[in-house]
Amino acid sequence: MNKKKIRKLKIISVGRLSKEKGYDVIIKALSKLQTKDFSLTILGDGPEKKKLKTMIKDYNLQKKIKLVGFKRNTSKYYKRANLFINASHFEGFPNAVVEAISHNLPVICSNSQGGIKEIILNGRGGDLFRVNDSNQLSKKITSYYRDPKKLNKKLFLSRINIKKYSILEHVKKYQNIFNNI
């Protein structure tokens, strides 16, 4: 967790490269940042890869944004980052968000339908922005860059919250059910 001002934003986003994942929104938001001291690593593959590469080139962000493809072991990428962004239009159970939190990364997520709001406690455990709103996302990123303490405090709440999704917690719940039969 970052306690001081961040020298360089090292952003990560993980998921299938498809329209509903909102990677175009992240790219647009990054193109609007005042600071150019950032990098974005996107892990995943999918039908939008060519379009995203074109967008990255159009915004002249080739040196800032890397599409690294699908990776089985994502841990080393999470460890290199200091911020996670999820811009999905809708999301069932966002495993990548839980993984990011478990790697001590503060998260900025769209307020999409699905499990994101539950995991980050309706914004108390991370920052939320309106779906498809690259302007608002850009402001959230800038806010984190200027004052990482605020989002890192929210990370603490998220880390407590995601414990209920651990395997150990599920085993305890099943044991309780079987003990009451």
Residue ranges and their predicted role:
Residues 9-32, 43, 47-53, 95:
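A conserved mid-protein helix/loop that constitutes part of the nucleotide-sugar donor-binding site
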Residues 99, 112-123, 127-128:
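Short acidic/histidine- and often glycine-rich active-site loop of Leloir-type glycosyltransferases
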